[in-house]
Every structure is written in structure tokens, then in C-alpha cells.
Amino acid sequence: MKHFEANFDGLVGPTHNYAGLSFGNVASLSNAALVSNPKAAAKQGLQKAKALADMGMVQGMLAPQERPDLYTLRRIGFSGSDANVLKQAAKEAPMLLNACCSASSMWTANAATVSPSADTRDGKLHFTPANLVDKLHRSIEPLTTGRILTATFSDPHYFHHHSHLPEHNSFGDEGAANQTRLCNEYGHAGVELFVYGQEATNPNAPKPQKYPARQTLEASMAVARLHQLEEDNCVFIQQNPDVIDQGVFHNDVIAVGNQNVLFYHEQAFLNTQHKIDEIKRKLDTELYFIEVPTAKVAINDAVKSYLFNTQIITLPSGEMAIIAPTDCQENPAVFAYLNELLTLNTPIKQVLYFDVKQSMQNGGGPACLRLRVAMNEMEVAAVNQHTLMNDALFARLNLWVDKHYRDRLTTQDLADPQLIIESRTALDELTQIMKLGSVYQFQR
């Protein structure tokens, strides 16, 4: 049976804007109040997804969240008509309105943690939506995320869906952005690397001082238990608190893995060699640990260019390629390193550059935009086929974006009641295109 690693990219929502909501994310904060282009953002994401599908990759799309989120605004005391709720919130609590209009669900690396059937005791693919409790604008996502995942991976014979973890900082969970999986072949049992920022229940353990550690060890261990993973299938690694304080808010900003390759910065982890030895003990295959030294790429350059927020994919030919943002080409140190990497004796033979600037300016590169799901061909066949990228879906979604999306959006525009109508009309049509059913609150 054939096995694949599918990528499910987040479709950028109609309210994509730059509100600077993500403390600890340097790009998000530094670009606050820029004018955004939701239409361009959605099309950039679709272009990347279609390019991977054209390379022979299994590529899907995940629907965005409903925004503005009027239900949250009503929960916190704003009342009256929908237009009045927006007007009140804009006047009395503009940052809360901004949080309820965020299109951050485009970064599906944070949507959930996924464990493939090759790793789990019950032989099913497991999904746990991330609770994202560290950031208000993301903490309102998990319920709808769960519905979208269930509508996409609906067959209970193959897919096991869990609820998100308790909504408390002790279980702060940011999903697959802090998890990577090493294996020989996608269909073989692998080792899942769970990277955490702090131990919530141990006040003496190392933790960052400037920016929050969004992922806890307690959350990572809870997800591993839910997913029925054996101890031999897991390695728990602490991210270096110093790099979190330099803007590395998720592990996928400083490391990325694929099959038998782990590509990471030398400052990424604590106790790096000890953890590499543990990986080698638990995974009996040839492994490539590609450590990028600070002398070649400084942390600041890694964060600005998102060198590690790249995708490493295995092409149908068996060679690996890096999917990088064009920002990596524009940074001399990073571009020089990537060119050097291609001359080294590793499975990575190509670097392909994509323009995802609308996402990058909000703090998310190519790896943020995708949720990896390793599957066999029977599981792929059980996926909602209307979510899988092909020529027809690409054309239809581009027409849908042209019809419904604005090409200019400011934070002041978020108070426009017309945005509610535009967004709901678009999402209602999208659920019909992708055959998702009533996943949104306004449809229920």
C-alpha cells in the first residue's frame, strides 16, 4: 500500500488584516496597522497549494473560521443588532473587536496535532484541535476547528477526533507547530517530537523571561496519551527559552523535520545532544541531523526570513525539496546557507521559493500555512474529496475569492457591518463548494 504525507493548507479568510495581536511574534507586532489585501493573501495561499499538488503531492485545503466572531462579542456583553455589536465593540474595546476579526486560522500548523495510524495503538489517525489559550484571538478557534476537521476527515473507521485540551495555561497547546515526526517511510512507525516551552507545574524549570512559552510539557504529554502513542514513539524536547525571547514563538520558527531529516538551528533546543541520542535509540534508521550554526545564520536572520518555517517535502521521485518564502532569497546570509545546503550530502536536493508575503507580514511562513497528515491510500480515499486540491477546485476557489474578497482592508474597516454580510455569504458558499455541512455558528 502507498503512503503519503498530505499537506492541508489554511484558506485565508475574508477578514485578513494586520492588527498586531500576537505578542512574542516579531513580524506580527512590527507590521501592526498596515493595510492588508485579503484577496492577494488568499490567492498567494492557493498558488502555493496548487504548486504542491502539481508536483504530485497530496494537497488539501481547510476552511477558515467565521469572522467577525459576533458570538464571542455577545458573550462578553455587546448586544443589539449585529451592526450595533460591531459599533459598540469598535468604540469601547477596539482590541477585542480586532481579536474577533482575526484571520489567524489560516495558519493550520496551529489547528491541531495529528498522529498517523502507523504510530497509534488503535491504528487510526488521531486529531486533537489546539486550544491556543495563550492568545485571545486564537483561543476562540478550537470548536469550529474541530467541526472543520471532522467534516474533512469524517470516516470514523479511519479517523479519531478528540476535543481540545482544558482551556488553562497549564495545558497551553499550539498544535503541530510544536510537533514534528521522524520516520523511515511515512507508513512505518515513527518518532513524534513534541517540543515545549515550559513545564507549567514546575516553577523551578527553565522558561523564557520576555515572551510567553505557549506550549507546556503537560499539554504535549496529554496529547501523546490521547493519541495512544507508546513511549518509544515519543521524544519530549524543551525549546531553548533564550530563542523564545528572541521571537521564536513556535518551534516551527527554528526547526523542521521530514522523514529522516531534522533541520534545526544550533540554539533551537535545550540538551540537544542528549535528545538526539534519544531519537537515535528510538528510531533505527539512517538519520540526517542538519544543524545550522549561529556563525552562518543568526537567530535574527532566521526569524526575519523564516528559514525554518519552510516545508520539507518528499517529492514523488524520492528527493526532498524545501518550500521557502521569497524572504529567504532576500536575506543574504540565509540565501547563501540554502545554496550551500544543496551541496551537502543530505536528501534535500532543491529549494523552491514562493511569495507568501501577506502571510509573512503577519508572522506566518509556508510551514505555518499547512497541517501535515501522513496517510495511506485508503485513508486518502476516505477524506472528503471536495477538500483536495486539483485543477477544478483551484479554479473554483479563485473565482470564489474574486467574487467575495476585498483587496484592501484596514483595522478601521473591521467595524463595517457590511463585512459581516460579505464574510457569511462567502463562507456559506464555501461550505457548499467543499461539502462541509453546517460547520459555522451562523448556519446552525
Curated annotation (Swiss-Prot):
It catalyses: N(2)-succinyl-L-arginine + 2 H2O + 2 H(+) = N(2)-succinyl-L-ornithine + 2 NH4(+) + CO2. The keyword Hydrolase applies. It holds the Pfam family AstB. Pathway: Amino-acid degradation; L-arginine degradation via AST pathway; L-glutamate and succinate from L-arginine: step 2/5. It is an enzyme of class 3 (hydrolase). It comes from the Bacteria. The active site is at E174, H250, C368. One of its GO terms (molecular function) is N-succinylarginine dihydrolase activity. The keyword Hydrolase applies. Signal peptide: none annotated. GO terms for biological process: arginine catabolic process to glutamate; arginine catabolic process to succinate. InterPro entries: AstB_sf, SuccinylArg_d-Hdrlase_AstB. Keywords: Arginine metabolism, Hydrolase. Its EC number is 3.5.3.23. Substrate binds at residues 19-28, 110, 137-138, 214, 252, 362. Catalyzes the hydrolysis of N(2)-succinylarginine into N(2)-succinylornithine, ammonia and CO(2). HAMAP family: AstB. Belongs to the succinylarginine dihydrolase family. Homodimer. This is N-succinylarginine dihydrolase. It comes from Shewanella baltica (strain OS185).
